[in-house]
């Protein structure tokens, strides 16, 4: 009869203990009166440096720094003789805690019961929770053998998520607008840790992208200063979204290409893709749309043997070529490759002939201001009447009134005053002084 009463008292004590645990730890899982399971958070106040070896364990491949580890699962089984005559059976489950530490910790829990021979579950749980804050006495620097990449990923992901949850429940003052926000409305930069509200960062970085101020896409806190590195693409996307980030990548890539003298852009207006060319080579192929074109004239590819079609002012081209010949011979050779040396030589000769002809016209003739026809005066006065019907001055080329063409020569203010019958020599002197 006595044994039955003792067994009944034990059950009541265990039931009361489990009810108390349920109220203290609502997240605990209990199964009947003899089994329980509880996740113990492992959030430390110190940084832990975890190094991982290569598969052959010859080198260290990576080192991570964390403060949060995946939960330790604490299970207990209560025998019938508990709490006075038999201790609980404890099982500690963890993907990262070494087996040696698990055994030491389990032994310490049994020792707690040995000291009192009574209900010990609360003390056991609190003991585990207290030393969890120091990662169960593990050193702050640990080395894992090869083959633990999955564990590294698990710890990193857990630590990142735990830090995010901590961040979201805190309050922060934005260093731009100085208002206070919940962490859920803020963003913390990875490199420096500075925090600003999402609205201010989004507005600022959007403006930087739209205005092409790519070097300013970095931390805006004054402590970081002008030498702060630009944001990572992942951070930028978290703030301004995918569309603007893609636009930034396109513009930044184009700017980088524009600074490369060997990069030219597709002449198709709808493409504008980059193409890398070898110096001196005509053929260029767009990396975006595969369009083949001439790197010199931007026209559809016309072959190495066909010269580029000459467009624009040939005189400017000749001036450029002659200047290159004197100062930058390699650029003169590039023009010869583009248009062909014979064509360039012919243009040089033509421009020189045109200049000589223009000099003769300047000294010996005059162009009609209406039709540009060259008029030569053999004899007579300086009042010219062109075939197109225009009256003009042979000396200065000015229009003359048909009703009174000689007023121009009788006006004291006119540059041609008194020179109605100027000689050829006087015409040359006039041209040298007034043109």
From Swiss-Prot:
Domain RWD, residue spans: 16-135
Positions bound to Zn(2+) 3: 266, 271, 286, 289
Residues noted as binding Zn(2+) 6 in the record, renumbered to the chain: 393, 396, 408, 416
Binding, Zn(2+) 4: 294, 297, 302, 308
Cellular component GO terms, alphabetical: cytoplasm; cytosol; nucleus; ubiquitin ligase complex
Record flagged with keyword Transferase: yes
Highest rank taxon of the organism: Eukaryota
Alphabetized GO MF terms: ubiquitin conjugating enzyme binding; ubiquitin protein ligase activity; zinc ion binding
Top EC category: transferase
Binding positions (Zn(2+) 5): 368, 371, 386, 388
Keywords from the UniProt entry: Cytoplasm, Metal-binding, Nucleus, Repeat, Transferase, Ubl conjugation pathway, Zinc, Zinc-finger
Active site: 381
PROSITE patterns: RWD, TRIAD, ZF_RING_2
Span list, region TRIAD supradomain: 170-420
Keyword S-adenosyl-L-methionine annotated: no
UniProt-listed Enzyme Commission number(s): 2.3.2.31
ZnF region ranges: IBR-type: 245-308
InterPro entries linked: E3_UB_ligase_RBR, IBR_dom, Rcat_RBR_RNF14, RWD_dom, TRIAD_supradom, UBQ-conjugating_enzyme/RWD, Znf_RING, Znf_RING/FYVE/PHD
Reaction catalysed by this enzyme: [E2 ubiquitin-conjugating enzyme]-S-ubiquitinyl-L-cysteine + [acceptor protein]-L-lysine = [E2 ubiquitin-conjugating enzyme]-L-cysteine + [acceptor protein]-N(6)-ubiquitinyl-L-lysine
GO biological process, one term: ubiquitin-dependent protein catabolic process
Residues that bind Zn(2+) 1: 174, 177, 197, 200
Protein name: E3 ubiquitin-protein ligase itt1
Gene: itt1
